[in-house]
Amino acid sequence: MSKIIDITGREILDSRGNPTVEADVVLEGGVRGRAAVPSGASTGTREAVELRDEDSSRYGGQGVLKAVGHINGDIRQRLVGQEAEAQESIDQAMLDLDGTSSKRRLGANAILAVSLAVARAAALAAEKPLYRYLSADERFQMPVPMMNIINGGAHADNNVDLQEFMIVPVGAGSIAEAVRYGAEVFHALKKVLRGRGLGTGVGDEGGFAPDLSSNVAAIEAILEAITQAGFEPGRDISLALDTASSEFYQDGRYVLASEGKTLDKEEFTGVLASWVEQYPILSVEDGMAEDDWEGWALLTQRLGQRVQLVGDDLFVTNTAILKEGINRGIANSILIKVNQIGTLTETLAAIRMAHEAGYTAVISHRSGETEDTTIADLAVATQSGQIKTGSLSRTDRVAKYNQLLRIEAELGDKAHYPGRQAFTHP
């Protein structure tokens, strides 16, 4: 066992140039674990609270010195002397110290930075890579990536309503091959867009962010790129969507501004169903708004036996909300974002609950990221089988792919890439 002897928090920048929290945890013997937390752009209303300074004289009010102060003060005082291997006890101590259901006193960003740094330090002390330290056994499954190569919605300054248009290398035989598939399609898509006189600047998650005539135009551009790169849509590479529907849900209706359409839940479900019928789409995330549970029930009834329906804003990595969704038969998958809930222990509990209920769990980044690669190790350790970590562009995204490549190389023939079988309805 290794006791914590010091904890330090600091303010650093994320990939959007906004402040975020980083923490170092030092153990006896000098081992140091470090973790940095991400931040989202389109956020669920029930996410754990990210504490910001609201001081307009610094970073437009987005500073995180209050959260850092809690790490260097109350949290440090409470945890120094604790055993780093006692992750659940440490996380519970921080929850008790915070004393709120939303983590609004200390800030989920402060709590999470320390929670993840403790795990990293404990793994180093055990002389294990993080994915092995977090794993319940010696079975390791590499995640199939959903690669966001066209960004819209809150992730880009363009006219596209839907937030993410993703490629999924289901026909690859390894993560190395999947990354190659993705990179080749990414470069082919750049040529397709440029050939149409469209912009090739990238959005928050590294995907292209052109103005397009419709949401379907994004799908069709990607299909053309897949073909031009030498792959077969649906066999080698499938598609996934994150509609982020809460972002355009207004007064009980879905407003697709780029297409001049305002749809009720039945009509929007019909639109999604028509896309699933017409294109090789195997996963739809946040197909309905987080508060539209009637819409979710309708969507699940209509498409739940055909494609993966992922709840992100719907479930916010929260076991209480996920349990309600499971009991009501809503969706069939959960997106896992560590900063939505705020501790490693609660994150692992959400993954376990999903798997026990027959739901898939997709480990995910946020639009505001750092060089931290924890989610890559987490995806392998929990055998979740799927990961979302952006496009094949921007170091904050590529860092996670590179970590997966390292893990796969280290595991050798123990690394299993599930391909299409990772999805609810392959």
Swiss-Prot record:
Q: Which pathway is it part of?
A: Carbohydrate degradation; glycolysis; pyruvate from D-glyceraldehyde 3-phosphate: step 4/5
Binding of Mg(2+), residues:
D242, E285, D312
Q: Where in the cell is it found?
A: Cytoplasm; Secreted; Cell surface
Q: How is the cofactor bound?
A: Binds a second Mg(2+) ion via substrate during catalysis.
Biological process terms in GO annotation: glycolytic process
Q: Which Pfam families match?
A: Enolase_C, Enolase_N
Q: Which family does it belong to?
A: Belongs to the enolase family.
Q: What is this protein called?
A: Enolase
The organism of origin for this protein: Nitrosococcus oceani (strain ATCC 19707 / BCRC 17464 / JCM 30415 / NCIMB 11848 / C-107)
> What are the top taxonomic ranks of the organism?
Bacteria, Pseudomonadati, Pseudomonadota, Gammaproteobacteria, Chromatiales
